[in-house]
Swiss-Prot record:
The gene is rpsP. This is Small ribosomal subunit protein bS16. HAMAP family: Ribosomal_bS16. GO terms for molecular function: structural constituent of ribosome. One of its GO terms (cellular component) is cytoplasm. Belongs to the bacterial ribosomal protein bS16 family. InterPro entries: Ribosomal_bS16 (IPR000307), Ribosomal_bS16_CS (IPR020592), Ribosomal_bS16_dom_sf (IPR023803). It holds the Pfam family Ribosomal_S16. SUPFAM superfamilies: Ribosomal protein S16. One of its GO terms (biological process) is translation.
Amino acid sequence: MVTIRLARHGAKKRPFYQIVVADSRNAATGRFIEKVGFFNPTAQGQEEGLRLDLDRVNHWVGQGASLSDRVAKLVKDAQKAA
C-alpha cells in the first residue's frame, strides 16, 4: 500500500522532515517513490516551514495513496493557506 508520510532528516534535536510517497512496507527513512515537499517544525522568522506540491499529493491520493495523520493535517493547513 502506498502512503504519503514524513521521513525524518536533520541533526539531533533539530528535526527536518521530507514529505515522501513510499510503499508502507519500506522503512520510514528508507526507499521512497517521490518527494512531494518538506516540513520544518523549527522554522523561525523568514524561514519556510512547509512546502508541499499539492498537485502531486492530489495525484497520488487519486491513485489510491493514503495520508498519514500528520501529513493529512499539513495538507489541510497548506490548502487553507493557498
